[in-house]
């Protein structure tokens, strides 16, 4: 199993706070049944981080958050 580190994700989203918000929002989407953008059997939080590290999901996640 490949490990996901914060450093891998920081290459895509340099701000740690924005990274945490984007990962949280995407993990919630996945937990609610949205289709993952990568193939994985991991939990939603890990899938969200993998999507960010691979570049499939980025800061644009934060623009979709309802206020």
UniProtKB/Swiss-Prot annotation:
Q: Name one GO molecular function term.
A: DNA binding
Protein's UniProt keywords contain Repeat: no
SUPFAM superfamilies assigned: RPB6/omega subunit-like (SSF63562)
What does the record give as EC number? Answer: 2.7.7.6
Q: Which domain of life is it from?
A: Bacteria
| Keyword set, alphabetical order | DNA-directed RNA polymerase, Nucleotidyltransferase, Transcription, Transferase
Its recorded reaction(s) are: RNA(n) + a ribonucleoside 5'-triphosphate = RNA(n+1) + diphosphate
- Please provide, in alphabetical order, the Gene Ontology terms of the cellular component aspect for this entry: DNA-directed RNA polymerase complex
Q: For this chain's UniProt record, which GO biological process terms are given?
A: DNA-templated transcription
Q: Is the keyword Nucleotidyltransferase assigned to this protein?
A: yes
One Pfam family in the UniProt entry: RNA_pol_Rpb6
InterPro entries, sorted: DNA-dir_RNA_pol_omega (IPR003716), Pol_omega/Rpo6/RPB6 (IPR006110), RPB6/omega-like_sf (IPR036161)
Q: What class of enzyme is it?
A: transferase
User: Subunit info?
Assistant: The RNAP catalytic core consists of 2 alpha, 1 beta, 1 beta' and 1 omega subunit. When a sigma factor is associated with the core the holoenzyme is formed, which can initiate transcription.
Family of the protein in this entry: Belongs to the RNA polymerase subunit omega family.
- HAMAP family recorded for this chain? RNApol_bact_RpoZ (MF_00366)
Q: State the protein's purpose.
A: Promotes RNA polymerase assembly. Latches the N- and C-terminal regions of the beta' subunit thereby facilitating its interaction with the beta and alpha subunits.
> What name appears for this protein in its UniProt entry?
DNA-directed RNA polymerase subunit omega
Record lineage: Bacteria, Pseudomonadati, Pseudomonadota, Betaproteobacteria, Burkholderiales
The gene behind this protein is rpoZ
